[in-house]
Amino acid sequence: MSGDLSPIDKAKFVAAKRAAELVEDGMRVGLGTGSTAAWLVRCLGEMVREDGLKITGVPTSARTAELAREVGIELITLDEARWLDLTIDGADEFDSELNLIKGGGGALLQEKIVATASDQMVVIADKAKEVETLGAFPLPIEVIPFGWQTSQALVEETLISMDVMGRSSTLRMNGASPYVTDEGNHILDLHLNRIGNPRQLALVLNQIPGVVENGLFIDICDTVVIGYGDGKVEVRDINEGTIETDRIDFVETDNLFADLND
């Protein structure tokens, strides 16, 4: 079955597998959203079923909640948990300071709330997500539906004074209709190409009326686990300043990989 998975999927899996090893009995764990985070949820589910791992998960989207229930992870709400030991999530881009762009999966608001309510945030990603400067991936911002075009115009006007290379934005669509987040909002994708000052941009965007949250995660991520298609894994801890390398044996099992299609 290993021939059925692309090198990128293998990289995502080994990163998720390595990150799952950070989870211990009794932990309250934030469960991210997206294709890489889905591997993590599957890995944790296998540990719950086969190793007796006892954890409670807080999902960052309805999709993640559904998958977590399918694989046997006990779920609670963030209000019930109050605070989390660890959140593990993917990223669309990350730089050397572990600043992130997230929100490609449409769950940036809940993802940021859960991540900031955790003692530690670990990002899992393949090597292709590492960039020298953020911005090649469109930056998502969540806006309320009321007056979204006005919010869009204000955002584009604000970008004129920001250190970015592009200033256009598009409303994310789901077929012929606007994409709707779990919170009932829309998403504008900002095509910036390069973000010279992510910290400043994150602060300024959230001051614009109608903007609920943006996909820049600044000073939130503590560790990144980078997977490679050959099974190599690199763990970078921004707080400790350490870099560890490891190798994960890639053994596919039907119960772990079946129906993982996102």
Curated annotation (Swiss-Prot):
Q: Catalytic center at which residues? A: E111
Per its UniProt record, what Pfam families does this chain match? Rib_5-P_isom_A
Pathway, according to UniProt? Carbohydrate degradation; pentose phosphate pathway; D-ribose 5-phosphate from D-ribulose 5-phosphate (non-oxidative stage): step 1/1
The lineage's top-level taxon is Bacteria
**Keyword Cell inner membrane included in the entry's annotation:** no
Entry's Gene Ontology BP terms? D-ribose metabolic process; pentose-phosphate shunt, non-oxidative branch
Q: Where does substrate bind?
A: T33, G34, S35, T36, D89, G90, A91, D92, K102, G103, G104, G105, K129
Q: Which reaction does it catalyse?
A: aldehydo-D-ribose 5-phosphate = D-ribulose 5-phosphate
Q: Which GO terms describe its cellular component?
A: cytosol
Which keywords fit this entry according to its UniProt record?
Answer: Isomerase
The protein's Enzyme Commission number: 5.3.1.6
**Molecular function (GO) terms listed?**
ribose-5-phosphate isomerase activity
The record's subunit annotation is: Homodimer.
Belongs to which family? Belongs to the ribose 5-phosphate isomerase family.
Q: What does this protein do?
A: Catalyzes the reversible conversion of ribose-5-phosphate to ribulose 5-phosphate.
HAMAP family xrefs: Rib_5P_isom_A
Under what name is this protein listed?
Ribose-5-phosphate isomerase A
Origin organism is Ruegeria sp. (strain TM1040) (Silicibacter sp.)
